[in-house]
Amino acid sequence: MNSIKIDSSTKIVIEYIDKLRNCSNEKRQKVSSVIRPVDFPGISTQQLCDILIRFAYNGTYIDDVFRDHLLKLVVDKSITWNQVIHSVINTKTDRIYSKCLQCELIREMVNYVQIKSFSDKLHADELISIMKPTVFFLAQLIQDVLSDEDELEMIQIEYGDVRKAYYKPLEALSAFIHDDLCSSLLAFSEASEITHQLELCRDSFSKLRSPDKSATTLVEMLIERHIEKCKPVKFQYIPEGIALFDLKNPSIRILIPIFACFKNHESSKLMAETIQTFAEIMRFYGPDVIFDILHGAILLKCEESMDLLHFPKQHRADFRWQSTTFFYKKLPQIIEYLIRSEKLTVAEVQFGLEKALTDLSMMFDAADVAWQNASFLTLLNELEPVLGKTITDPLRLRRREHMKTNDQLLPFADTDNQLIENTDIDKLLNAVKEVMNLQFGQTEEFSKLFVDKVKTGQTDNFDAITSILITEGRLMEVGKAFVLKNVEAQRSSAVGVNERIQIFDDTFILLSRILIKNPSVSINMFVNGGPGKSDAEQTMFYKWSMRYVKRVAKHRDPEPKDETEYIALRKEVEMLMRLANAEVGIEDDLENDVEEEMPEVQEPNIETQNVDEISIPDPLHLLIENDPTVTAESKETEEVKFNPEGVEQMDTNEKPAEISDSLIEPTLLEEPKDILENIIVPIIKVEAPKPDSPIKKKKDPDVTWHEVHCPLPRISRRTARAYLAQMKEGIPFWKTDDPNLNIGSILAAIPRLGQLLVDEHEEKRNRIDRKSAEENMTNILHAIESMPSLFLCLLEWLDCEPESGARTSLAFTINLSLERYLAVSTHGINYMKWIFIKSTVQQMIDELVDKSPAFPEVTCTAFSTARRFCPFVGRNENPDQLKLKHAWYYMRQQAWASPHALRLLEHANTAREYDVWSHIYISKTIKSGCGDIMTSSVDMIFSFLMLDDLNSIIRIHESLMAFWLSEDAGQCQADGRFDPLSIRVVIRLMTQVLLIAEWTLDRLLNEDPAFVERLNLKEVKAPEPEDPDKREKWIFLLRSMLERTINRFFKIVRKGLLSNVVNTIIQLLKSIAGSADCKAKRLLVKRIPPDLIFQLAYIEPSSVDYSLMNIYCDPDNKEHTQTKIMFLCALRRSQSFSF
């Protein structure tokens, strides 16, 4: 007899079964509490499962002891659910009825389907590997049972079963497909093959002689459910609280003044793509996009043609040519690009034009009167090649008939074909023709025409050409060309001095007007012809413009830490000054000049006791002090002022002057001069500085950034006095017969001359001989008649001086003298050039002479609610919070951004104060408490980012993350930052910022020329526009911003605690997933890993659902599929399915 060899694992299993049988026979205790596989070291749980199933389903009956024990082992996880299914599928038996009975175990195992561990994604593959074989096994078993209908009936008779044998596998199959987790897992397998197997089962049922309608219906339902579960689930996000207000959106309208007035150098393609991206993010329809573009463009023109309340035209920037150029040149190109790139259809554009023609009729009327042109008809002429005559003719007819019914518009009804001469449109078209010379290589011809505009005083034509150059992106090229001409004329050459002076003067005036009238143009890029540096930065024009073209300061002055560093900086500045003087041929002794400016005064020997302060009263002061009508405050303001030069110096405070005039008789006013001449004024003893503070000599001013980076040459004060005396006689101070004359030395005299003129007006402010001062200034103008650019420089220098009474007085003198000079010099050679200069500096003169517009002292809310005021901002002013609030209310009430209000934001951006205005506007938004206002306000803030898109996007994103998504933000709940309605609006802004950041990054990566990473960047600051590597640096910064955001999300979520911050992250992810399908969303979704959704499901399963996970998973990415399976299992673990 042959012996059977049994391996050790089988022996252990047999031992386990024997013990189980014995315990069952003795019935002493519950079997489940007595026997467990863990008590049998080395046992194979899969082999144990196989044997338990054989004993449980052996023959024609079911052994409940073994069956129940098996199920209990599954419950306490001694045996896994997939081992049971594996045993059922692979256990061999010659009785098909027994196999059908075993299917009830599969049905039971459906509730236990779960991943083995969440620590390893590979366990997800194990889960998938058993799904498809199980369905195939059940489907095949049903087909085998139904294959022989006679045998089916015999089985039912033999075993005395009331139900058909196929019901057990069919119920198991139904449980498998109806279970949310199992049916979702089946979708990851070959769905078509599973569908095919189910269809075969249905066909088998249909072939029965005695059809089973209930079974057939059940199979059909299973097919439908499986197909439905295999379809991708769409995520729908409805932000509670603000969804009803997502109707009126000002974003596109606000983009128009930004592109027209502040980013007019951008290409039409970029403008169109940005507008389309905003439209996609905001879920705008095509006709609404066209309507809002036209609305914004026509609003811009209407505002430019009127005076704003408390904001006259002489105190505000002129956007006349920017608005005109945008409407007539850029706007048709933008619409054409949207059509040709298939962003919009012709039908959508037609519908938008019809809506604009109906709703904006009155605004077009006002614009046509201002432009003296049929603006809408001219626009249709430009769009006719892409729209076709069948669309444009009916619109043209409607507009023309309307214009003919209005007497005011009748003269302009046919101006789309026959322009009126000398109108803005006529000048603009002429400018376009002249700029075309550059395209044909006729650079010299264009230069001659452009300079002629300066010589003939054609300011409008000049500004029109400048606007076209900026629009077409050729201003930098032209600027560098004229700077090179200016440099060539500045230095000595074979050309005569007078001719060099004329060329230098013409080009200097031309370049200066461009920079003055276009403050958004970078001086560095304008001079260098684009990003990077060149020798042009060594020119006098560059150095002068960097110091005296009044703009918001970009660079902070160096702050020395101690006296040693301060002295080193002063020495460096002195060395740079000597080099600059040597370059232009100035040989003045500046060291003696310093001593001349600040002479040492010996302290008189006064025999008194030790006191902190010594002073001798002024007789005028005594008269005022003894007068009982004078207040204590007035007495405190009267001081004896020490004049180091021994010259009389008047107090510049207005109040004491007024008091003295009213209290002292006229006869007394003449006496102090004789009295003061005989009074010795002692030095006032000053308290010694503290040891820990840096010691600075009083005569040494602070070192500025401009002194270090763009030093100007300088003449001595003694030489300046001689020059000024010569000019007061009407004689130029430079030699026109010196062939080696460097014109830069002439320019270098202006600051000293200006300072002397200011000093003269300071000394005689209250009793200046106005007639004599005007005559002297008029003579000075005659002296520089051949070089009017010096007058421009004098005004620029005075404009940058600190505000004082002397500065204002000198401005009055210059203004009156200029009018007088122009009145008597109408036949002069350079008369028209002087007219051109007067137009250039008129705003400077107005601001120097007149006071800035003042606002009533009331609260922002009451002030702005009562009337719509646009705040004033100086050309170099960094607006404070009060003005920014006024600008916000001004824009908020109109749901549109005036370029004059946007100018405040531009200044704040230039001063790197992004956080200031963004914090104010976000705070005002979330405190409004009205869904309509909050939604519209957030969309306005989003549009403001385009003023300085790259900087603003990063800075406002950092602010939002720091306030709402920092690790400790959840502890700050008392301040209301997580108020339900407010947080919805903040999430909306966060979503918009992330979307536009991703789109901007993609644009930078894919624009021409092809991006090549050259720098190994690890940390970098925001680059300036002049930086040649700015593209690569911005790409690095945007990438870092997005990566840091995702990392912060993971860091917060991995703590495993549900908080307000985690809830905000959940809502943000839902908002991104629910945004409109566009390129920005697709790029951002790819960046967010599905692991983040899985982590959130692990913390709070009810907060996320399967449709959200589908958004962030790529079906072709295996790791994403594994994560999705883990996500489903996490939902099963908490029984929180939401499919």
From Swiss-Prot:
Q: In which tissues is it expressed?
A: Expressed in seam cells and all six vulva precursor cells (VPC). After VPC division, expression is restricted to descendants of the VPC cell lineages P5.p, P6.p and P7.p (at protein level).
Q: What is the effect of changing P751L?
A: In n545; many defects in reproductive organs; egg-laying defect, sterile, protruding vulva, vulvaless and male mating defect
Q: What is the residue range of the motif Nuclear localization signal?
A: 695-701
Q: Which residues form a coiled coil?
A: none
Q: Please provide, in alphabetical order, the Gene Ontology terms of the cellular component aspect for this entry.
A: cytoplasm; nucleus
Q: Where is the protein situated, by its record's location annotation?
A: Nucleus; Cytoplasm
- Which first-to-last residue range defines the signal peptide? none
Any one of the GO BP annotations: vulval development
| Impact when changing C103Y | In sy29; egg-laying defect
> What is the recorded name of this protein?
Protein lin-25
Protein source organism: Caenorhabditis elegans
